[in-house]
Design a protein with these regions (language model features):
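Generic structural signal for well-ordered, non-membrane alpha-helical segments
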Residues: 3-4, 14, 51, 55-59, ...
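Gly/Ser/Thr-rich active-site loops/lids in small-molecule metabolic enzymes
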Residues: 1-8, 95-107
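A conserved active-site cap/scaffold subdomain adjacent to cofactor or substrate pockets
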Residues: 1-23
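Glycine-rich phosphate-binding/hydrolytic loop that grips phosphoryl groups
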Residues: 111-148
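Adenine-nucleotide phosphate-binding core of ATP-dependent small-molecule kinases
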Residues: 19, 23-73
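Glycine-rich phosphate-binding loops at beta-strand->alpha-helix junctions
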Residues: 77-100
Length: 148
């Protein structure tokens, strides 16, 4: 996130169009792509600091959200990864889960690697981790049909 005063300074001093700032910030501004799955795939084959930063920032934001939820519900038994990034990137899952090792959350690295639906945590992990593939568009369609 940005300090709100930065936007005013950029506009007044640098004449930066704020709509362009929003359009070209985030993953796109860091890496030239807004597709995190493509960024993670490209980062496997090369060492690009901006790609690494984008991945780390994404994982940090997810870790903050999950950590906050865990503290509010006073514990966790299961973390489920779904959606494009959740099911498509073993690297993202590994990085996110690493932050929660203090909860005795341990991934089974072989299961995590193959992106198969089911439990991907180590059998001795206190907190289980699951991978669930869904057709997001089909799920959205089901919800929308309830309103028609």
């Amino acid at each position: 996130s940005l300090d709100p005063t930065i936007l005013d300074i950029l506009y007044k001093n640098k004449k930066i169009d704020l709509s362009k700032l929003y359009q070209y910030s985030g993953f796109l501004g860091l890496t030239g792509s807004s597709d995190l799955l493509k960024i993670t795939e490209k980062s496997k084959n090369r060492s690009n600091e901006n790609e690494k930063l984008a991945i780390d920032l994404y994982c940090y934001q997810v870790q903050k959200a999950v950590g906050s939820a865990i503290s509010q519900i006073k514990g966790v038994d299961l973390i489920v990864f779904t959606g494009g990034i959740g099911t498509g990137s073993s690297l993202i899952r590994k990085k996110i889960c690493a932050q929660f090792d203090y909860l005795n959350l341990k991934l089974d690295h072989k299961k995590n690697k193959y992106h198969l639906t089911g439990i991907i945590s180590d059998r001795y992990s206190k907190v289980k981790v699951a991978l669930v593939h869904i057709d997001e568009m089909q799920e959205i369609l089901k919800v929308c049909q309830n309103f028609i």
